[in-house]
Amino acid sequence: MRVLVLGSGAREHALVWKLAASPAVSRVFAGPGNAGTGEAGTNIPEVKPLAFDTIAEGCRAHRIDCVFVGPEAPLAEGVVDFLASLGIPAIGPPRKAAQLESSKTFSKAFLVRNGLPTAAAEEFSEAAPFERWVRAQGGRRLVVKKSGLAAGKGVLESEDPDQLVDFGASILREDRLLVEEYLQGWEVSIFGLSDGRDFTVLPPCTDFKKAHDGDTGPNTGGMGSICPVPWVDDALMGDIRARVVEPVYAALRKEGLCYAGILYFGLMITPGGPKILEFNVRFGDPETQVLLPMLGADLGSLCHAMISRSIARVSAGSGTAGAALGVVVASQGYPDSTEKGTLVTAVPSVREAESVVFHASTTRDAGGGVRTGGGRCFTAVGLGKDLAQAASRAYEAAAGVTFDGAWYRRDIGRKFMT
């Protein structure tokens, strides 16, 4: 099977890296890819994820059997529908189902309509009624969410009415918003793989969304992640499956929204049980970078099962023994601003049994040097017998990634090691 991974981030590098090791995959390509995917597979730089004609040409020229869509934007724009019209199988939802991620108002309505566990919420499209509602809440902590795509940064948690109103007003100039009750508990990421009918579930992950140590600062796309999650035992996974995963897939089938691809369940484990915070309709970043090294099953075979409606005949397994921890190395100014084109002076050589360094949007200049693409530039992943060993190896690798302005959180996973 010849697979094209669409995208250029660290998630896509991890996908190319894992697929390249699959006996079910004869060639793996990345479009446009980055400096890392060009080492693990073959880049097609002419392919642009939002320029569908370039995807079609890349698929034709390289005889692609399956397209694995990495980022959310082309899914929201209907790339899977486009590929289906050409007879090319794809891992990802059609445009209608992609609204589970691209429209928080759509996904909240889906959850409420089907009686699925989620936070109570109100929807607003105008600033004045939103402000009146917020100021009537007596200063309780609330969560304001942009309805549309926001790269993980369209959320504010606060009890300050002025802050909430200002943030909401900035959203309402261009989009709708949801305001939700604030849920307390532990967050966990669950990924389901479906063939459009049946599904299997991967080991749990959790990510670290805040920019700075101690879970402080603004939200980001994610500054690190771990897999598995120490406090998620078999009993809790069984509860999540019974109360969330199975009912969600049943509701998707009932409404004609089930698809061949990935569904991410962003969950809050509250004293009253698991509640759904959000859906993504693709693998997460940085969760993918720790999940795939821990995946005992062959990813190529899982991809074939998803597009051939045979996921019930394969198993994703329970994951390999040990732990993985990922540390995102970001550029100066992230998440508020980004510097691009900085020369990377070192990327460490690592033993894959101990660590892996995934590139994000890096490029090679005319002299062969690696240049940053801004924002989150690398994910350094450590593997070990436990989280502490994985953290030690991840931070050793992260320290070896050097470029002007590079920075990273120093406490990824620490709260789970005490």
Predicted regions and their residues:
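Short acidic-hydrophobic, aromatic-tinged amphipathic segments that line or gate anion-handling sites
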Residues: 43-51, 122-126, 158
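Generic C-terminus detector
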Residues: 362-367, 371-418
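Internal nucleotide-binding/catalytic subdomain
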Residues: 154-288
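ATP-binding N-terminal substructure of ATP-dependent carboxylate-amine bond-forming enzymes
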Residues: 1-95
